[in-house]
Amino acid sequence: MGELSMQEMPLPALFEQGSKIHASAESSVDQDTVRKGCEILRQCEEMIGKLGLFSVNETKEDISTANLKYILVPYYLAELTEKVADNDRIKVLKASQAKLKEFISFCETMELVPEEEIETSTQGGANSSVDRRAKKIARFKRQRAAESKLLEIKERKERRGRSTKAAALSSPVETEEDDVLDDDGEEEREAWLTTISLGLCKAFDLLEMLKKEEEILSAVKEKQLQNGEKEFSQAILDERTKKVETWHRDAAARAHYTKPAAPITCATFAQDVIEGRAKVSQAHEHKHQPLIFGPASLVGRNPTTEREKIAAQVFQPHYRLPTMSIEEAGLTEMNMMNEWQERNVKLMEEANSSWYKDAPKSRPGEDDEEDDDDAAQDKARAWDDWKDDNPRGAGNKKLTPCG
């Protein structure tokens, strides 16, 4: 769409197209679409000013339902302007903040801003962290309430549309169209007022965020100007790019003349051990090397300075790197298998030996224990014999009771 056709478009069509671009910009759009949306919304602002839709002497009750949506034009333009990619980021931030302040100021004139926000702005902002936290919580609650209310209005409108359609299909009697139109008008006004309230909550949060970003960028720019490093970022990027390109070019050139040796893998070495061409204890060189990630490929495998150590830790994998190579793991398992086989052979030899012929050697304390057992056994036998010779009560038979 050219500039001429955009000027010929009516205001409702321009606003609808700009609001669609604003809604799609919340996810991801290209810069051409963002700039086009900014141009459309600027055209909307120009047409609103020419038509004189709003006046500073009016309030929200004086504005018609059809014109309420145009209050959101500066807010939409501020959010799209903030998403514009430009070398001068501070300039973009200032332009976006100007539109946000214009939107908030106009809403305050129309009595659309909550009293809590007005009190905070008149006091010069919340000073303590407790006040800032309370303000953010109250704003978050208003935002959630506005979102819930918009969803409720949408569902209510859909239900009424379905019921109206079903009633029209079931009965040929004409329904009261005036009541339906009145309900639609009230819902539309309520929806736009709620949308403006939601936009105010987001506008206050965005304005605070842009102010902090502008302060940080201004401080960085001032520091660079003081140190004479105006072109610091671009020069560093060019130097790093050149260094990386040189390293890859040299590596590609070396690859044509260097023939890598065939690596001794775990499988080939195990096959050599099985077939008798190598021993388990034989030392050999492992060709598997751990991967190098990120700037570690530039600083080398053994960083010396603290800067190189920090650079080598950038872009590391999210998982833990192996502590041993594949060959070392295979050798460890092979040693475990050899020990297990030797232990099984020893157990088989002990099982097949003449264990019944080999008298087990007695331990030093076993003889004393056997002697104690024999003495206790003799004592028990003697006591049994005495009880047989002297039954219970045998010595009291001749005694007479005392008279």
From Swiss-Prot:
Interacts with NPP4 and NPP5, two catalytic subunits (subunit C) of PP2A. Pfam families: TAP42 (PF04177). One of its GO terms (cellular component) is cytosol. Signal peptide: none annotated. This is PP2A regulatory subunit TAP46. One of its GO terms (biological process) is TOR signaling. Residues 158-184, 351-403 are annotated as: Disordered. Involved in the regulation of the TOR signaling pathway. Seems to act as a regulator of PP2A catalytic activity. Residues 376-391 have a biased composition (Basic and acidic residues). It is found in: Cytoplasm; Nucleus. Its main location: cytoplasm. The keyword rRNA processing does not apply.
